From Swiss-Prot:
The keyword Phosphoprotein does not apply. This is Cargo-transport protein YPP1. Its main location: cytoplasm. The keyword tRNA-binding does not apply. GO terms for biological process: endocytosis. Keywords: Cell membrane, Endocytosis, Membrane. Disulfide bonds: none annotated. It is found in: Cytoplasmic granule; Cell membrane. SUPFAM superfamilies: TPR-like (SSF48452). GO terms for cellular component: plasma membrane. It is a peripheral membrane protein. Involved in endocytosis.
Length: 719
């Protein structure tokens, strides 16, 4: 075994521990054992808090049974384990005996030694700013997650009000502390540029300049809404004084996000190219976690393609490979796709370094968001795979991430699993997470035909929200949106459980609630048209119109259509055309109804409602008669269409077009794929074409989604 292999395996083990891994397979078995004990100490401190004291006491016994340590690195790790365990067991004096020791050379493993040093400083407490006066301190790699963990923890306790930084590392302290300003950072950046020059062929880029760009990146992240224009010139000047700098390219990517998205993407492309060239030369990436974070940033920022250099689907594919590479390289457990659904509620409690966990979890979540509207990614379980790993790599999963997971289970029609997850993982810990209560009620409506459970949940949530509102609770934008849709779900339940008249009686309460919640028109739900307050109000009118239409209340139907249209003139809502189409169809005006549905399909060929509306006209229910309007509709050529003539239907261009549109819908649209009526009409079309195999498949899917149909679509609880 060569010395090079030994060093490489030890280096890899130390790198693995720095990123937060728990698996070590170096040529030094005792080192692996010490690193494992170090991981377990962190795990018991941060994860298994309920059994922390007993677990740490047991771990201490294991450390004491180790053989006599002579190697400097071994001794340093053991001292840190003793120190942090004694401190966590409230035996501070014993702990200080270990963490107060001066760290030796640790056999030249400087990056790992830096982490041990910071760990000792943190547990020693009362850190003196003078500790960081030496110019030997440098900004750690982002892959050195434990180093960042302790550095950020120490910074929180430092008084930097009178600190005068002289090195990039010291400027990083000031930046992370929130005390750095654009003016003083720019002043230092100018002095750096003066002593920087483009490197010769045998030279590297200016190290200090490269380090300062890491400072700038943190500054841009913290102040992303207020980026100073002056930084652009510094970035351009830095490019002129460096060769294929990954750090400068990342600064440019971050800077141009708000200024010029295309340039941001171009710099991301440069960053990736430089990283790949580095890999070709060195057989490793300079900082794999940093590269992963850059992918996460750009995919969460840009959802649209910029041909030919940026295609989100291709970038996502490369991103997934990088994520899997980092998991494999550092033996970080990954939930395989085929097992993601089987153990959907059972994820491991990992104790990664906090910065590592943040990058990995947000990366998996970004992959989910990027594919959220992809039907293939839903069907092949890619989405649940992404969400499962986002949850597993998160140190403390947010309620929003947990809700995404629960919502996705509901989307997959894993109703029992979703209910169990909501109750155990969300509502027990977050009893005021109204979206989860709403989702729970919708799930219960799938499996309880009498709807009593759903009705009790909805009424209880509405009562709770009303009380909180009356007490002065300031609801968030998404909570206001949720409140309205919970109220609409209540109306739907009343209509289904009791009578249409009862639902109509409490309909005015929805409009009153809207006025109370959205009295301040200057507070929009979001930047998109479908996130505007007006759009939500139109949704309410659309719901009201459906009730009036069912009640055959022509006067109120017309009034609701007018109110819907008069809400705003800023944009045309295709939902108005849909509503108009169904009103016309209900009253026998098939030709005019067809025109409305066609108008919607012109703008959105995957509109489920428009296609169903058109299908109602082209393929009327067997008990219905074809009306005169339909027979003379030149748009869909129905002159030769007769009720009992399968042959004429088969040759009808209208039926052929419907077949094409429905098949395209179930190939592309998640909503279309999961709508029972879509499969019902497809089965009728396949019957016309004598395709019994596909007819049976369509009927099977129709039954599946009809049986697990919630009282309102799940999308109405997902803001």
């Amino acid at each position: 075994m060569t010395r090079g292999y030994i060093d490489d395996s030890v280096n890899h083990a130390l790198d693995s521990r720095l990123i937060g891994s728990s698996v070590f397979q170096s040529s030094d078995a005792l080192l692996d054992q010490l690193l494992s004990l170090h991981y377990r100490a962190h795990y018991h401190i941060n994860i298994s808090t309920k059994t922390k004291f007993s677990a740490l006491s047991a771990l201490l016994s294991e450390v004491e049974k180790l053989p006599v340590l002579k190697d400097e690195l071994h001794c340093a790790i053991a001292d840190n384990i003793y120190g942090i365990v004694f401190c966590e067991l409230d035996e501070k004096e014993k702990g200080l005996q270990y963490v107060s020791k001066k760290l030796g050379s640790v056999n030249g493993y400087d990056r790992f030694g830096r982490m041990l040093d910071l760990e000792r400083l943190f547990y020693k407490g009362n850190v003196d700013l003078a500790e960081f006066s030496s110019e030997s301190w440098t900004i750690p790699k982002y892959s050195d997650g434990l180093t960042w963990h302790y550095l950020q923890a120490i910074i929180k306790g430092l008084d930097l009000s009178h600190f005068k930084p002289k090195t990039p590392f010291q400027w990083m302290l000031l930046t992370l502390n929130g005390s750095a300003t654009d003016s003083n950072l720019l002043s230092y950046s100018h002095s750096l540029l003066k002593k920087s020059r483009f490197p010769n062929a045998d030279e590297s880029n200016n190290f200090e300049l490269e380090q300062f760009h890491m400072v700038l990146q943190e500054h841009l992240k913290i102040n992303n809404l207020n980026v100073k224009k002056e930084w652009e010139q510094f970035i351009i000047d830095s490019m002129e004084k460096s060769f294929q700098s990954i750090s400068v390219a990342k600064s440019a990517m971050l800077f141009y996000r708000k200024v010029d998205l295309k340039r941001s993407i171009l710099n991301f492309t440069n960053l990736v190219n430089y990283s790949n060239k580095y890999y070709e030369l060195n057989k490793r990436y300079p900082d794999l976690l940093d590269l992963v974070s850059s992918y996460q940033f750009i995919l969460s920022t840009c959802k649209t393609p910029f041909e030919p250099f940026f295609m989100p689907a291709n970038v996502s594919s490369d991103f997934l490979k990088l994520l899997e590479r980092i998991h494999n390289k550092y033996s970080i457990p990954i939930i395989e796709k085929q097992k993601a659904l089987e153990g959907s509620s059972d994820v491991l409690d990992l104790c990664l370094a906090s910065s590592t966990a943040s990058v990995l979890s947000s990366s998996w979540e970004t992959l989910y968001e990027t594919s959220a509207s992809s039907l293939p990614a839903l069907v092949d379980h890619s989405q649940i795979f992404y969400l499962s790993n986002s949850l597993q790599t998160s140190l403390n999963a947010s309620v929003s991430l947990k809700f995404k997971f629960a919502y996705h289970l509901a989307t997959l029609r894993q109703i029992d699993q979703c209910i169990a997850y909501l109750k155990k993982q969300i509502l027990t810990l977050h009893p005021e997470h109204f979206a989860s209560w709403h989702l729970l009620a919708l799930c219960e409506s799938c499996i309880n035909e009498d709807l009593q459970v759903s009705f009790k949940i909805i009424n209880s949530v509405i009562q709770s929200m009303c009380e909180l509102f009356d007490e002065g609770r300031q609801f968030t934008i998404d909570e206001k949106w949720q409140f309205i849709h919970i109220k609409l779900t209540q109306l739907q339940l009343v209509r289904d459980m009791f009578a249409l008249e009862d639902a109509l009686e409490i309909l005015p309460e929805v409009f009153e609630l809207y006025q109370r919640l959205f009295s301040d028109a200057s507070e929009p739900l979001g930047p998109q048209i479908n996130q505007s307050n007006d759009y939500l109000l139109q949704k309410i009118w659309l719901f009201a119109l459906e009730l009036y239409l069912e009640n055959d209340d022509i006067e109120n139907v017309k009034a609701a259509l007018d109110e819907f249209k008069n809400v705003t003139s800023k944009y045309v809502n295709l939902n108005h055309n849909l509503a108009q189409g169904f009103v016309l169809y209900t009253h026998g005006h098939s030709e005019k109804a067809t025109a409305e549905f066609e108008k919607v399909l012109h703008y959105d060929s995957t509109s489920v409602e428009a296609l169903i509306g058109l299908a109602k006209i082209v393929l009327p229910d067997e008990e219905a008669n074809l009306d005169t309007d339909l027979k003379h509709n030149s748009k869909i050529n129905q002159k030769e269409l007769h009720r009992n003539s399968a042959t004429s239907l088969e040759t009808s261009s209208a039926v052929a077009r419907l077949k094409f549109l429905f098949e395209e819908l179930v190939d592309k649209s998640i909503e279309g794929y999961q709508t029972s009526a879509v499969w019902w009409y497809l089965s009728k079309i396949y019957e016309i074409y004598s395709d019994s195999t596909r007819q049976q498949e369509a009927l099977w899917r129709c039954i599946k989604y009809e049986e697990l149909q919630p009282v309102r679509e799940f999308k109405f609880c997902n803001f």
